[in-house]
Amino acid sequence: MGGMALTGNKAVVYKGKGTVAVEDIGYPELILRDGPGVPKANVNRKCEHGVILKVITTNICGSDQHMVRGRTTAPEGLVLGHEITGEVIETGRDVEFIKKGDIVSVPFNIACGRCVMCKTQKTHVCLNVNPDRPGSAYGYVDMGGWVGGQSEYVMVPYADFQLLVFPDKEQALEKILDLTMLSDIFPTGFHGAYTAGVQTGSTVYIAGAGPVGLAAAHSAQLLGASTVIVGDLNEDRLAQARSFGCETVNVQKHDRLGEQIEQILGEPTVDAAVDCVGFEASGHGNQGEAPAAVLNSIMDVTQVGGSLGIPGLYVTEDPGAKDADAKTGSLKIRFGLGWAKAHTFVTGQTPAMTYNRNLMKAILSGRAQIAKAVNATVISLDDAPKGYSDFDKGAAKKFVIDPHGTLK
């Protein structure tokens, strides 16, 4: 159906440091062709277990921005986008359960469903989709070369295992701005809060008021936190956090986070903390970029025996880092402090499939209001470069690309 009837496919393409463009990349096939970032072992990989989606929504993510800023080794020509929601318009011959017309959420982790990691729900480190290292994602550096989904159409492999089918198509379209967050940031934020041990009555500090930080804050509320404090240096993003009931601290105005927390809680520590910033962190006060700043500060303010959820991205190669150690992902972390306080650290990609079905139920029931929390803002595919620019400038928005004008 799709391959014969359609030929064009506009997509967001990385063109080098600071630049993305919307270009025609050709209609997808059920095969992974050679291209930017595709390892030799993945070239011409057949995907009869896959489907072609007509993309309904695809979101700009903070981890996309790391690449666009030139802070990774992403190759020019890489098609971006790993937050994908769409309608199935073509199925491979080995697809048994997914049907044409299904509206689905695509977990950003690509996972085969067959390896020992997938069978133990560690889909974020699948062993069979990326020849270079465990784990994979669409449109991302060193992640297997799978073509990104900031496009009109995209191929998704291992469809029966991976895709989350929405039970009612009409309801799904009504709630699409919430449901589009299931591909990444809602599970990622929830994973951060959940692995930090947030439960009924917890006090929580969230580092970062970008979309993932706001998703973690909303998730902490869903998990029963009594007080959620969000820290950032962007006043617009802090105002967005306050809009749904969070307390906030501007970390640029003070170099002692514990004192800021004490002004809110009456004590300088929290039960749980979540790092939603990652390696492009800024130091407290006016210290400028300091990659270990967030990790060190959350160790400082998390109570003895507490847990730290770390969904913020850290990399093994950072060509834009200011010192030689940081270029290889080596950070000056006060690990002795974490050891002395018996902290638990949970890092890595989020296994989105662990959480997305239950979070879908929370959205469909009205319990979760994730689009409101992250200020979901719809833009056209042609406006994606401006969306990247505005997001890079600190816009307090989660940009949702609508490639076909479905949401008008």
Curated annotation (Swiss-Prot):
Keywords: Metal-binding, NAD, Oxidoreductase, Zinc. Binds 2 Zn(2+) ions per subunit. GO terms for molecular function: formaldehyde dehydrogenase (NAD+) activity; zinc ion binding. Its EC number is 1.2.1.46. Its cofactor is Zn(2+). Signal peptide: none annotated. Belongs to the zinc-containing alcohol dehydrogenase family. This is Glutathione-independent formaldehyde dehydrogenase. It comes from Bacillus subtilis (strain 168). The gene is yycR.
